[in-house]
Amino acid sequence: MGFLKPTMAILFLAMVAVSSAVDMSIISYDEKHGVSTTGGRSEAEVMSIYEAWLVKHGKAQSQNSLVEKDRRFEIFKDNLRFVDEHNEKNLSYRLGLTRFADLTNDEYRSKYLGAKMEKKGERRTSLRYEARVGDELPESIDWRKKGAVAEVKDQGGCGSCWAFSTIGAVEGINQIVTGDLITLSEQELVDCDTSYNEGCNGGLMDYAFEFIIKNGGIDTDKDYPYKGVDGTCDQIRKNAKVVTIDSYEDVPTYSEESLKKAVAHQPISIAIEAGGRAFQLYDSGIFDGSCGTQLDHGVVAVGYGTENGKDYWIVRNSWGKSWGESGYLRMARNIASSSGKCGIAIEPSYPIKNGENPPNPGPSPPSPIKPPTQCDSYYTCPESNTCCCLFEYGKYCFAWGCCPLEAATCCDDNYSCCPHEYPVCDLDQGTCLLSKNSPFSVKALKRKPATPFWSQGRKNIA
């Protein structure tokens, strides 16, 4: 016990040091120490900040080679310099070391933002929220304070922002009409809404509204939880229609006044251009930085207001609570361009709900248990595993291993395997790459021996 107390004290001091390093990375060095940011920090000091950032964002174990770590460190240093130079200008918004601080802007855009998608067919533009002379709207509104906005969520590395934007708007109108804030399932949209939308490869909110209407409702996040990967549609959960909507409409385009009128009545799905470096590293304040109108990210407008004479929108993102203002962004409102900041007024849309949800049918039956994955007549792996041959001769496999992922890549070393999102095996580094020569990698998984079933193998074959 005598050894335990000093150890705990050392750990506590280390944690304080880490916390201080992270805080220092967000406040300019000039403010804290009175020296120039450019060249003001030593290499060791920046490395300390970087190591603390890795721990904070759970990336400490994600770099599997010194070359990769050195490359990420150089990118981090450049982003840190960009953050400090911006914050020294005392503008309306501040930057910080977000979860994207070790990515170049090209990497950030290619991994976390979807390609621009054009809606097929005409928009359902309605005059319901068209701005008119004489409209009396509140000076500010925040649907979070009215209980119509669920907790900030995190889409992860899946390009499913469209699903989070859709669900956020549906959760909002459902609470406004029924009084119940029910957290709904983005994963159901990712898995099941595949007629036009493409799961982790992008989609549009209007198509997702159409899916919910045609399906007769959508399930809860609790019963159909988010996984962050494309999956097979669970038909039983798809038929659990907990929350319904009756229709959807589009806000008149290129009109921030019409968008204001819409947001005064309910949370609104919006699309914006989020690919700029300042957006990548946004920390707080009213964002009025450089951005265009190449819409590549779906979010939710949940309010608006004014601070020190500057109008803003309140926007809920889907990158977790560590990004921005606890997961939110304030964007400049009433700018000179009719498209709004970052194109916010180009494609806003919203669900319509006229009445209560269907009666609660009680607990739904669990989804059927999937059978084991069958490797051949003599070996099986657990459900949702991939069979990988351990020993083969000619065309025959004499021993099987199990990779604990669906649709995995079996590496040629007969020992490891890779997720289907990172299908390229790097046997030298023991990692899986997003593509050949890609900077993005994860650690390769080990196979486990398959289960033999000598006596009943043939009996179980369908």
Swiss-Prot record:
UniProt function note: Cysteine protease that plays a role in immunity, senescence, and biotic and abiotic stresses. Involved in immunity against the necrotrophic fungal pathogen Botrytis cinerea. Involved in elicitor-stimulated programmed cell death (PCD). During infection by the necrotrophic fungal pathogen Botrytis cinerea, functions as a PCD-promoting protease that is released from the ER body or vacuole to the cytoplasm. Accumulates in endoplasmic reticulum-derived bodies in epidermal cells and may participate in cell death in stressed or injured cells.
Regulation of this protein's activity per its record: Inhibited by the cysteine protease inhibitor E64 (L-trans-epoxysuccinyl-leucylamide-(4-guanido)-butane).
Major location category of this protein: other
Primary gene name: RD21A
Gene ablation phenotype (knockout): No visible phenotype under normal growth conditions. Mutant plants show increased susceptibility to infection by the necrotrophic fungal pathogen Botrytis cinerea.
GO BP terms: defense response to fungus; protein ubiquitination; proteolysis; regulation of stomatal closure
Glycosylation site residues: N90, N414
Active site as annotated: C161, H297, N317
Residues spanning the signal sequence: 1-21
Covalent S-S links between cysteines: C158-C200, C192-C233, C291-C342, C375-C387, C381-C402
A GO cellular component annotation in the UniProt record: nucleus
Species annotation: Arabidopsis thaliana (Mouse-ear cress)
EC assignment: 3.4.22.-
Subunit structure: Interacts with SERPIN1. Interacts with PRN2. Interacts with WSCP. Interacts with TZF4, TZF5 and TZF6.
GO molecular function, one term: cysteine-type peptidase activity
Keyword Glycoprotein: yes
Matching Pfam families: Granulin, Inhibitor_I29, Peptidase_C1
Protein name (database record): Cysteine proteinase RD21A
Annotated effect of mutating C161A: Loss of protease activity
Family of this protein: Belongs to the peptidase C1 family.
Lineage of the organism: Eukaryota, Viridiplantae, Streptophyta, Embryophyta, Tracheophyta
Taxonomic superkingdom: Eukaryota
Subcellular location: Vacuole; Golgi apparatus; Cytoplasm, Stress granule; Cytoplasm, P-body
Keywords: Cytoplasm, Disulfide bond, Glycoprotein, Golgi apparatus, Hydrolase, Protease, Signal, Thiol protease, Vacuole
